[in-house]
Regions:
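C-terminal substrate-binding/catalytic lobe of Rossmann-fold NAD(P)-dependent oxidoreductases
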Residues: 3-52, 131-255
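Short, hinge-like loop/turn segments at secondary-structure boundaries
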Residues: 45-49, 98-103, 122-125, 153-156
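Short glycine-rich anion-binding loops that position phosphate/pyrophosphate groups of nucleotides
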Residues: 64-65, 87-88, 110-111, 193
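Rossmann-fold NAD(P)-binding glycine/threonine-rich loop
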Residues: 71-72, 76, 85-106, 116, ...
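Short glycine/serine/threonine-rich phosphate/pyrophosphate-binding segments
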Residues: 12-17, 66-69, 115-118
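Rossmann-fold dehydrogenase core element
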Residues: 80, 95-112, 130-135
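Rossmann-like NAD(P)-binding element
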Residues: 51-69, 75, 79-84
């Protein structure tokens, strides 16, 4: 039985995790961490890690600052962490990598298996089409999402750009530029509205045809499932920095 601590337990993803884990027999929630102390059913919730009396794998769905705090607490106390928050800066990501030298850190801005397959397909399409086709990414999310573009859109863009040896320049806004599209532009567009859980389209646009790779999340349960799988995966691993690619490919990065 794997014990799990959820940071951001009051949020949408926190509630989805409570529902998913409650139906499982291989793990359990021993505590939550959020802005205010309280309870969710039988689960105690603490207002910060300093008050936490128990141990377990930390799953973080909170904020950039919360993600760093979780990783640093995990590193100081030997607790594995699954970091799912988006909007992290380069400095935040560096802090996660530093923490991974002392405890297992699993990092993904999108815990969906399908999205990560989409990323692999985008890599392959870039290898075949990238020299002749323009590439655009369109992401859609609910009206309450704070960051734009989404962390997933940036994951896709980074995967494409790595495959293309870093030749692309990300373009988020064309309203101030009156000129033709540059050959090395990679456009990223964000849509916010209603209750859209998450949709990502990658367009490879040629002169006479368009290839579209698309993923749509039907509910937040898909992200909760992935986060739980990640928590079970890293629970007994050595310190290191792990990603969804490691989980999907079954690779263990242990030194």
């Amino acid at each position: 039985m794997t014990d799990i601590i959820i940071q951001g337990i009051y949020g949408r993803m926190g509630r989805a995790l409570v529902e998913k884990i409650g139906a499982r027999e291989d793990c359990r929630i021993v505590a939550g961490v959020d802005r205010e102390a309280g309870r969710i059913g039988e689960i105690p919730v603490y207002a910060g890690f300093d008050a936490l009396p128990c141990k377990g794998v930390i799953i973080d769905f909170s904020s950039p600052a919360g993600a760093v705090a979780a990783a640093q607490y995990g590193a100081a106390n030997g607790l594995p962490c699954v970091i799912c928050s988006t909007g992290l800066s380069r400095e935040d990501e560096a802090a996660l990598e530093a923490a991974s030298t002392r405890t297992p850190i699993f990092r993904s801005a999108n815990m969906s298996v399908g999205v990560n397959v989409l990323i692999e397909l985008a890599r392959q399409a870039t290898k075949i089409l990238g020299g002749e086709f323009d590439i655009e990414i369109i992401e859609k999310h609910h009206r309450n999402k704070l960051d734009a573009p989404s962390g997933t859109a940036l994951m896709i863009a980074d995967a494409i750009n790595t495959e293309a040896n870093g030749k692309y320049e990300y373009v988020y806004d064309r309203t101030q530029v009156r000129q033709k599209r540059g050959a090395q532009e990679l456009g990223i567009s964000s849509i916010r509205g209603g209750g859209i859980v998450g949709e990502h389209d990658v367009l490879f646009c040629g002169p006479d045809e368009v290839l579209t790779l698309s993923h749509s999340a039907g509910s937040r349960g898909v992200f909760a499932d992935g986060a739980v799988q990640a928590a079970l995966y890293i629970a007994a691993l050595a310190p290191g920095y792990y990603t969804m690619t490691d989980l999907l490919r079954g690779k263990l990065i242990c030194e």
